From Swiss-Prot:
This is Dol-P-Man:Man(5)GlcNAc(2)-PP-Dol alpha-1,3-mannosyltransferase. One of its GO terms (molecular function) is dol-P-Man:Man(5)GlcNAc(2)-PP-Dol alpha-1,3-mannosyltransferase activity. Pathway: Protein modification; protein glycosylation. Disulfide bonds: none annotated. It holds the Pfam family ALG3. It is found in: Endoplasmic reticulum membrane. It is a multi-pass membrane protein. It comes from Eremothecium gossypii (strain ATCC 10895 / CBS 109.51 / FGSC 9923 / NRRL Y-1056) (Yeast). The chain crosses the membrane at residues 125-145, 169-189, 207-227, 231-251, 291-311, 344-364, 376-396, 409-429.
Amino acid sequence: MSAAVPTTRAGTPPTLQCGWRSACGKLLDIANYVIFSPEASAVVMPVLVAWECVLLKLIVKHVPYTEIDYLAYMEQIWQINNGERDYSKIEGGTGPLVYPAGHVLIHRLLERATDGLQNVARGQDIFTWLYLLTLVLQFGVYRMLRLPPWCIVLACLSKRLHSVYVLRLFNDGWTTLMMVVAVFLLLLAARHPRLCLPAALVYSAAVSIKMNALLYLPGVLVALFLLTRGHLLALALCGAVAVAWQVLVAADFLSTHPAEYFATAFDFRRQFMYRWSVNWQLVGEQVFSHPTFHRCLLLSHIAILMLFFFTRYAAPRQPNWFRTAAAALRHPATAVLAASPPRAHVAYVLLVSNFIGVLFARSLHYQFLAWYHWTLPALLHWARMPCLLALLWYVLHELCWDTYPPSSVASATLYALNSALLLLLYINGPPA
């Protein structure tokens, strides 16, 4: 008689049961690797780029384009092409030209590419490539920061962001591209300090497109100081390069109407429309428009920046800013810091500075999500939230931006979410 195969109580042979357990264990290991291991990003990122290529084509094909600001951009460019150089007289259907000359340079090229409004489909193609190029460069930043794949996936999940790029053709995407390139170069400069100069140039290009890039300015100054190891002459050279670009790109306007250019292109007193404010529907329109409210936001912005500056931004090995500054002033042609900071520290300084500015911005319109959405994967990772809690945070954040028209509940929720994230970023400090 043949021996009977031993079975478990459930009637399953032990060898088969062990096989199932082994297979399940391997699947769990693979899932854990793909979700949490930074090394898996080399596999996840190409898949996400391919997915975005398909998704963007489907969006453009099946969702109608909505005209909001692109016509106004073209009307302003037509006036410039006709010889107008007084910025205070250049207007479009939605108001005056309030963007610096880098915006004009880009949209002159776009006006040719799209033949004004005759070929908006080509413009959508250009903005599709703009989105994808920005995404690939973002992924380069994430790779250097060793973000886990679950964070990286968040960069591709915003319905609002896809709309801003390929269905609205807002200019915010161009500023974001320049800022991502600038951050990318500054992270590389942690090992190759000579890249500080091109980083300063690209940052200046971002500012010349739209002023929101100035939210990064405190972080950029700190990062350049740390990356040049406190070498003040090197820092001054970076500043000179940045200023030179501003003069060069605006030369046509500065040579004829300089006062009008600065007053209009860099108008810090500009009034925003309350009805489109995503972040301040929780206050009344009278409060929103009152100068005292604006001053309170500015003072709060400065106070929080100072808190981070003195307690979180200093060089890891030399935390006393006063001693560092004194040494730099005594020896402006000498590097006074022992070493360049780690890449993660540079990124923390840059991205948190921008996020603080977003939190205290006088208004956030729907397209302004592009200012900081790309930084959320890194910020959520540094906040050290559990994965599921971070995903919940992201979903709620996206719902706030997808609420139309803006509501007081969505505004209050958005402010609470962003405040909680900033608090966690402060508590946990720069990543090691």
